[in-house]
Amino acid sequence: MRSVPVIAGDGRQSPPSLSRLRLLVFAALFSGLSACGLLPAEIDQTADWSAARLYTEAKSAFDDNNWEEALKYYQKLESRYPYGRYAQQAQMEAAYARWKDGDEAAALADCDRFIRLHPNHPSVDYMYYLKGLITFNGDLGYMGYLSSQDQSERDPRSAQESFDALRELVTRFPQSKYAPDAQARMNYLVNMLSAHEVHVARYYLKRGAYLAAINRGQYAIKTYPNTPALEEASYILVLAYDKLDMPELRDDALRVMRLNFPDSRYYTQGLEPKKPWWNFF
């Protein structure tokens, strides 16, 4: 508990007690010794380890999913042996470990740094792939049906970032072993981005913002052709033009829709809730 200074009769504070002076002297002395390095420091057991041993310990922790421990060794390896194959391998694995440890921003920064420093590395394609995985907010639909969340309602920024990274991978390295999975994820992401635009168009339609609904629907049709959400986008155009009392544009939109979707359920069911496009069961 902090002591309260005693006020003398003339209004002056009384001098601090002797015990308090001793504490202040000891604290100052301890700080001085620490600053001069006279006190024993904690011994780093890894101080004389080779790059190979540091990497072996890091990889062992990595394989056990002990991301924090792995990162500790990777950081020591990079700081002591910044050049060579061990350092480069550590940089790649550290990016993955940071992602799995929950630090997506640092993981993305690691990927960008590696790509910038080692553009001709034989495994640089993996770093583009990892960038796509870090920002990929989906599961290719394999287990998505277990969740009731509508993917189209999610913030599309990370999906767009993931798509851009994966597209760069398949463009730069079409023969990469990661390219097939990257392409499958890109297909999923395009469908999700399209569904998001249609979700926004439906939102505007329900709230009477018909021109905004038309703009969103048209954008989805032009930007994401051949995606499942375009059927609904086409129907939204028909409804919005009808609400705006534009019969010619409505009939033209309906004609195009009947040409592309002759058996659409929207003709009889309207905009009723339906299963998400990724929900197969």
What are these regions (language model features)?
Residues V4-V6, G32-F281:
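Acidic, polar-rich low-complexity tracts and alpha-helical solenoid repeat scaffolds
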